[in-house]
Amino acid sequence: MGPVMLDVEGYELDNEEREILKHPLVGGLILFTRNFHDAEQLNELVRQIRDASHERLVIAVDQEGGRVQRFRDGFTRLPAAQSYAALNERYQASRLAQEAGWLMASEMIAMDIDISFAPVLDLGHDCIAIGERSFHECPEIAMDMAESFIKGMRSAGMKSTGKHFPGHGAVRADSHKETPRDERSLNDIRQRDMAIFKDFIQRQLLDAIMPAHVIYSQIDERPASGSPYWLKSILREQLGFQGVIFSDDLSMEGAAIMGSYAQRAQRSLDAGCDMLLVCNNRKGAVSVLDNLSFVKAERISALYHHRGRYTLSELQASDRWKKANQMLTQLQEQWQERA
């Protein structure tokens, strides 16, 4: 399987996209809001993607909840991560987070989608790019909520992706628009932001990790997503992480410091990423495919969903889905009223 995850433009594949998906470097595809009209159309698009590729691709989406939820009509409107602990006592918050993880994963698997890039493990709500996507500013509470969410995902048959290593929450800047700089010491980052990653790796709660397009300037002048120090020395060697490392989208401005699209891809791969996201720029994606040295992404196949297929309507007829949908819809409405 190839190490590149691409996107497509619309509701169905065009001929160019069918050819691109056959490229040996392509190993995954991520879906966005622009790819979604309704559940029936989405189901057909996923079928087209499966049929177009010579190998089984990992199909992904960002279906976190709150403001980052690509598919809405016909699916449960998931609450923002911050809402669980903000509006509930600890036990109930954990219970709701677990049901949200299960429901989100179950709905995506019903569409034959392998993974949602979740959960967000960043701490605090001040960063423009993170905000309500963070479970809490307190590491212990964030760990409790995130662990419950992961347990729910796994019970549905979906693997987890913790993001954004080693922590994006302490910078205000948005890495979609610029390259943020975190001026803290390595010890400060270890004691706070990295603690949740370390704990979850030790307890084997993370199947994949996505590093941040953030420069931690006291440690390395390269973004973590393109830093061998962060990905090989810290994540692989010191923390012992054996799962998949995804780059964040290489079209983000936070990655531009690494050079052209082909250079960003090669540097991220050399730094230790297993799969590279190249989205929202077809020319850049083609440049990556034309220039990247072929590397087989051995770890990626571990992320395929592993539950028997059921339709979305069959899932929505189940008692557990009905109860979870009711609780989470109520929480989402309460959170919107508060906002």
Swiss-Prot record:
Pfam families: Glyco_hydro_3 (PF00933). It catalyses: Hydrolysis of terminal non-reducing N-acetyl-D-hexosamine residues in N-acetyl-beta-D-hexosaminides. The active site is at 176 (proton donor/acceptor), 248 (nucleophile). The record marks 174 as: Important for catalytic activity. Substrate binds at residues 62, 70, 133, 163-164. It comes from the Bacteria. Keywords: Cell cycle, Cell division, Cell shape, Cell wall biogenesis/degradation, Cytoplasm, Glycosidase, Hydrolase, Peptidoglycan synthesis. Residues 171-185 have a biased composition (Basic and acidic residues). The keyword Hydrolase applies. Plays a role in peptidoglycan recycling by cleaving the terminal beta-1,4-linked N-acetylglucosamine (GlcNAc) from peptide-linked peptidoglycan fragments, giving rise to free GlcNAc, anhydro-N-acetylmuramic acid and anhydro-N-acetylmuramic acid-linked peptides. Belongs to the glycosyl hydrolase 3 family. NagZ subfamily. HAMAP family: NagZ. This is Beta-hexosaminidase. It comes from Proteus mirabilis (strain HI4320).
